[in-house]
């Protein structure tokens, strides 16, 4: 049996009714990754229609591959959304959007959103798969939090020849770029150490 990452808790379900809107404002045609943060207004209105299948069929590698595709700026398939009664329903692309939400919120089926959804009762197998997914993502891409740190503090990043997706390794909370590595010392300051580009 294949091991799947359970991302079903990340987008709540709701009854999908098409209601004519009298609003004159058009919904935004694009969204930013920060719109998927747990406390973001856009994220709070996301819903999966009841007829959507569970978002629990992707392997850890497939979740990692999709997040990597996004992080490296490659083309990803469109996600189809529908606004109705103040909610934004995901008509197509629930797995893709859930994978990004998982990365942004560090919740691969075992984080705070999932714990609340499952009333803090998460199967050990689900926790194990979530940890495996997190490890794969942190190794190859880096956590969203580390990417945000790199964006907010570019002066702490030493320019190098590595691909951006390889730059951050949250498993040891350091930033690696080019032939240098920044690592937090015991005193809390960043120290650079020689390091080759990760493969």
Regions found by a protein language model. Give the residues of each.
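N-terminal leader/domain-start detector
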Residues: 1-42
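Basic- and aromatic-enriched surface patches that contact anionic nucleotides/nucleic acids
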Residues: 19-29, 52-199
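Short, compositionally biased low-complexity segments
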Residues: 33-45, 159-166
